[in-house]
């Protein structure tokens, strides 16, 4: 049991963690929902079992001033999970917050749009990454998580790990994509990561401990796609 919290909150928090794990959620989702309850607990002196709408309105108003809308939404989702699974109460405040609408990039691009994207991207890592996503039909997170071992050149397929629904899947590997990936790998020669982080430059890519930065990839994609 967690000992750094008051006893009543520690029991609730431990129950929250158990329910999160039993639901088979992704580790990053578990971390976010757990952090939400810790933050709420700290704000309300660890008494969060009977919060009113007025109290939560005040909490989220303060949170918006110091955190991103993404963090605000995750705290809301974490509280909703806690309310329904730990407190066993119905969630009665669906309209508590309303994030501003954002312009999202299309999930599917045409062949012409994809070609313009590849040609307009100046950074080699991003260009190869976008080409790989498009040719294999991967999501952003799936592409970032690719490793050298996931590429099966003999059977011409790619193993995508922890895909949607926490399931692994196999996708066909086009010959052109294999050729591009092989040439690209020669530029960094990382023993594991297919798209190593370039924060330390090309020479440091071989020793990178993480893949390309998700935020940097999204920002570059948005700039190119909306140019």
What do the predicted segments below correspond to?
Residues 1-227:
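Conserved catalytic core of the tyrosine transesterase superfamily
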